[in-house]
Amino acid sequence: MKKQRIVVKIGSSSLADSHEGISKEQLSDHVAALARLKEEGHEVLLITSGAVAAGFSALGYPSRPVTIKGKQAAAAVGQSLLMQAYTEEFRKYGIVTAQLLLTRSDFSRKEQYSNAYATLGELLNRSALPIINENDSISLEELTFGDNDMLSALVSGLVSADMLMIFTDVNGLYDKNPQKNEDAKKYYFLPEVTEEIASLAGDAGSKLGTGGMKSKIDAAKTALSLGVSVFIGTGRGQEKFVDVLKGKGDGTYVGNAPQKEMKMNKQWIALHSVVSGQIEIDAGAATAIIQHGKSLLPAGVTNVSGFFQVGEVVEVMTQQGRVIGKGQCTYSAEELRDVKGMQSQHIQARGERHSYEVIHRDHWVSL
């Protein structure tokens, strides 16, 4: 089996015990299986939930707290307990772990996004196993973030993973809730996430987690768009993750055909960047960009909205108001208003610029 880069996401329901916080038995089972992946020569990243579940009992809560302050207090206590438990278990296999706590802002800010990419790459080059969690104790987003499901998809795209394995307490995707419907049909393989499939998932999570099957389907759709195939399911024992790679996993495989990888900069533009303005373009420019993969030139710009600086991300729309994509603009809004509709040779005659693309195709994402 060739070396692969694997992101494994373990949810609260697959890790925690409702009475004791962290289930040592379940955690040991996961670590043993992750160690087997490493033993087979694969690069492994772990996205783990469970900080809130690990910490609430230590603070004297009888069950998972429902208030924001309670959840964040439990996470502040639980994150250190969770990481300590992982570190001790992985040490038995001679595996060095590294902790990364991320928030949504780490993805939306380009410099921090690039730093996360560089750090993860260096850790993998050094054979460490990164353990990643949302920074629950300060981030409100995590509490409605889908139990780290979307985080796992975004990380898998960032590191150009070969596969994302989302482990939960349900063995795959069904056309109905299998706990309530005996005739529920299981999907063993889905080539893509269609609107029909997305509509089948409910919103409810487990008692310990915040993410239901809907968040997992949304995460799978995002991962596929980034060139990463997905497995959603469950399992026990040391071979469970290796079995997934062999096609023997107890769950649903989603889009396991080779996917087209999206480069890091385009991932940031597509999924994380903040839109600072809008550019309206004519039909000829829209055709050149969408059908022929060309860069956007000033001649095709008909209107500029907003106040943005060089390098900021803008939406591009047709004269009919349809948004066709977004990209990093090489002009400020003020500069672009001055040259919109002008041919490149006329701008060149001014002697003001060396580059004339408004948005270069390498910094463009179609929507």
UniProtKB/Swiss-Prot annotation:
SUPFAM superfamilies cross-referenced by the UniProt entry: Carbamate kinase-like, PUA domain-like
Residues noted as binding ATP in the record, renumbered to the chain: 9, 168-169, 210-216
Entry's Gene Ontology molecular function annotations: ATP binding; glutamate 5-kinase activity; RNA binding
Keywords assigned by UniProt, alphabetized: Amino-acid biosynthesis, ATP-binding, Cytoplasm, Kinase, Nucleotide-binding, Proline biosynthesis, Transferase
Described function: Catalyzes the transfer of a phosphate group to glutamate to form L-glutamate 5-phosphate.
UniProt entry tagged with the keyword ATP-binding: yes
Residues annotated as binding substrate: 49, 136, 148
Protein name as annotated: Glutamate 5-kinase
Main localization category: cytoplasm
Organism, scientific name: Bacillus thuringiensis subsp. konkukian (strain 97-27)
Keyword set includes Cytoplasm: yes
GO terms classed as biological process: L-proline biosynthetic process
GO cellular component: cytosol
Catalysed reactions, semicolon-separated: L-glutamate + ATP = L-glutamyl 5-phosphate + ADP
Pfam family, any one: PUA
Enzyme Commission number(s) of this protein: 2.7.2.11
Family, as annotated: Belongs to the glutamate 5-kinase family.
InterPro entries: AceGlu_kinase-like_sf, Asp/Glu/Uridylate_kinase, G5K_ProB, Glu/AcGlu_kinase, Glu_5kinase, Glu_5kinase/COase_Synthase, Glutamate_5-kinase_CS, PUA
Annotated signal sequence range: none
